């Protein structure tokens, strides 16, 4: 069975205060393509015998959300507007959490999920006549926490896996 593209969901916590309940924004409206660029750091070495070996040194993932059409009704809009227009660069405005969910079986209520700290950084502001755009890039940071997520009305609830 081949999973449909909508099986991979990406949420950003727009409650950047660091306290209280997460307020998850589902990334994807008006976006036709969204991928996690894993940014694999791969080194290939060839020895004097002509043999090749590969070293995987790690990942530097990023996610480009382009286009994002500025919409004051979107929970993520105030965060993007503050960063783009006030040029803020601090953790209070840019650092938050992301949640990736894979829906492998729509009949199940809990789905594999991973939560991770991240930075949400606008790339530009402006665009063409189709509307004001603030494309942004999500930069994951630190370790991921695996678990499950239940989703109701496009709002996830994350439960970490037991250790």
Where are these regions (language model features)?
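Short beta-strand and beta-hairpin "edge-sheet" elements
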Residues: 29-34, 100-146
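Solvent-exposed edge beta-strands and adjacent loop segments
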Residues: 1-72, 119-130
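Short, low-complexity, polar/charged sequence segments that are solvent-exposed and flexible
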Residues: 83-88, 118-122, 139, 155-160
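Protruding loop/beta-arch "assembly-hinge" segments enriched in small, turn-prone residues
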Residues: 135, 139-163
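Extracellular/virion structural assembly segments
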Residues: 2-3, 49-115, 146-154
């Amino acid at each position: 069975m081949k999973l449909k593209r909508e099986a991979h969901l990406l949420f950003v916590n727009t409650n950047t205060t660091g306290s209280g309940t997460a307020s998850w924004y589902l990334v994807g409206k008006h976006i036709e393509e969204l991928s996690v660029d894993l940014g694999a750091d791969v080194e290939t070495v060839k020895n004097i015998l002509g043999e090749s070996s590969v070293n995987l040194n790690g990942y530097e993932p990023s996610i480009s959300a382009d286009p994002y059409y500025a919409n004051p009704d979107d929970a993520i809009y105030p965060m993007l507007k503050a960063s783009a227009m006030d040029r803020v660069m601090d953790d209070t405005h840019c650092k938050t959490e992301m949640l990736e969910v894979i829906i492998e079986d729509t009949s199940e209520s809990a789905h594999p999920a991973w939560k991770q700290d991240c930075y949400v950084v606008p790339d530009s502001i402006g665009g063409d006549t189709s509307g004001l755009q603030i494309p942004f890039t999500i930069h994951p940071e630190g370790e991921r926490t695996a678990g499950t997520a239940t989703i109701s009305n496009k709002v996830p609830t994350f439960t970490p896996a037991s250790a």
